[in-house]
């Protein structure tokens, strides 16, 4: 047992409260609003302590900047403000322990048991552990399973980490069987309004809009159901400036960017992308220095293109081969920086030859365009940024839950996105900044025999049904 490990535990017990409070409120004492996932994580803790449920291992992976540490801080702070014994509440910033102090997760757990004077298998009272940036110790899964989960039911562990953590968990049968994974994605519009303006959504409206758009049998049914919600939709938007949509699309998808200047946000996000490449992606794949540098160049190219691009052209632009490029694309998908849409309706649909890529957050696209000096083409790329928003939503709600897949129609008059649900339903989606025609979705609907086509438009407030296609204002979609 090293003295360094014991000092670390003592410091965390004494000071974590003050460190984490900085994530929950500003210098004036104003308490920040929480994201939707906080309610879920808090419920897991309450159920564990009350013996209602026995979910004892919660894994919360997500992109850098999505607010993982803040969720831990809010959960820790709420519990610490009760009569729960603060000695049995431990926050572990594992990246600091491993990278700065040179102590492993196992060292930390052993030191904590020494501090308590109890082994985990002989605990008299329950404990809640918060482990931040768990990927700092590559053996985290086996350590938690062997030293906590398999020896006691009186310890709950809530961990955060990069997208690599989710992949490691899914590929380990022991972890996936024992844990619950709750991914943290970029903020939706309603979360953005909660965080920025303390503007809360209308009860049950989100579920009703989602049900109308994705559980209806045809476009006319979508139109009918959404028409019934018009009053509530208008009520929500009644005191929100339309510029808030543009602010959200450009800089509002991460909590740390809210109320910050655009240039500062772009600089921070570009630094964040560098960290993802140099740390998270290194954990997901084996690349030499030249290839790692090419990944950022690849992102610059993808930010500026308007549609699908062949791998041959990309490989030539990056002076690399097809295999290396395919590996680069795959690792950016695994890191959840990019969302892949396969080509619809051919043997190529599951290959990478002509895949289309969206960004998990439009802020990535805007920040990359800013670096290349092309932010002045913002309005010509705003349609793609709206597509990023919609693609990210569909990924979160369907792809990540394994209930659907995303494709696109490569034809010149084909639709932007096809959501292919596991129930064999195809939903054809066309997206635009201005007023779009019905031509593209109709062509793709005919090709697929689909009864559901929608056009989602930013610059329109009119809900409309025509020729088997429903036109939906972006204002409706953002509330789903």
What are these regions, as identified by a protein language model?
Residues 1-55:
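A short, basic N-terminal segment
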Residues 68:
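Conserved lysine of the Walker
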Residues 71:
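Hydrophobic positions on the alpha1 helix immediately C-terminal to the Walker A/P-loop
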Residues 90-124:
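Short glycine-rich substrate-engagement loop in P-loop NTPases that contacts/grips substrate
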Residues 134-158:
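Conserved Walker B catalytic segment
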Residues 155-162, 183:
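Structural recognition of the conserved hydrophobic beta-strand(s) that form the central parallel beta-sheet
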Residues 172-291:
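Interdomain motor-coupling "hinge/lid" segment immediately C-terminal to the ATP-binding subdomain
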Residues 253-415, 421:
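Accessory nucleic acid-recognition modules appended to NTPase machines
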